[in-house]
Amino acid sequence: MGGCARLKSALLIPHTGKEVPYLIHPVEPKKVLCIHDLSGMGRCSLAVILPVLSVMGVQPVALPTVVLSTHTGGLGTPARLDGCAYGEQALEHYHALGVEFDCIYTGYLGGEDQVALAEKAFALWPAAKKIVDPVMGDNGKAYSTVTPALIDRIRALCGAADLILPNYTEAQILLQRQPQTELLTLSLIHI
C-alpha cells in the first residue's frame, strides 16, 4: 500500500456480519462564541466551558471579558484584567474574517461595558442562537459586583436571547423579586 492507509468503504454491522456502505463527509464543527470571564482559580468560567464544549465536538471561541485571579464568590477581592478592549478588537477581527457563529453563549459579565460586548456580538451575528447565563448571584444573594444598572442591562440582554439559564437566585433578581433560599428549601422538604 506504499504507507498510505485505505479508508474503508463499508461499515460492519455487529452481530449480523453484514457490511453497509457509507460515505464520509467532512463536517465542520459548530462554532460557539463564549463571552465569559476567565478565573484563574475556582473551577468555573471559561476554564470549565472550553474543554466541555471541545469534548462535545464543538469549536469554542473564547472571548474573555475579564481575567480574574479567582471567582468573585467569597475568595476576597480578585486581581482583575479587563478584556473589553481586546473583546472589541476580536469581534471586529472575526467579523472581518467572515467567521460565522452557530451560537453565542454569555456567562459572567461583570460590568455594563462587558454586556455591551455581548450586545455587539448579538448584532454582528443575528442568525446565531443566543444563550445567556445571567451570572449575578447565588444562594439568595447577588454578587458584590452586581449593580442595579448591570441588572437592567443583563435583563435586556436576556430579552434578546433564545435561551436563558438563570439559577434560582438569578431568576428572582431578573423578576425584580428579593432573592431568597427559604422558599426553595421549604418546598424541597415537603416533596
Predicted segment positions?
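Conserved beta-alpha-beta core of the PfkB/ribokinase-like small-molecule kinase fold
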Residues: 106-186
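Glycine-rich phosphate/adenosyl-contacting loop at the front of the ribokinase-like
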Residues: 18-79
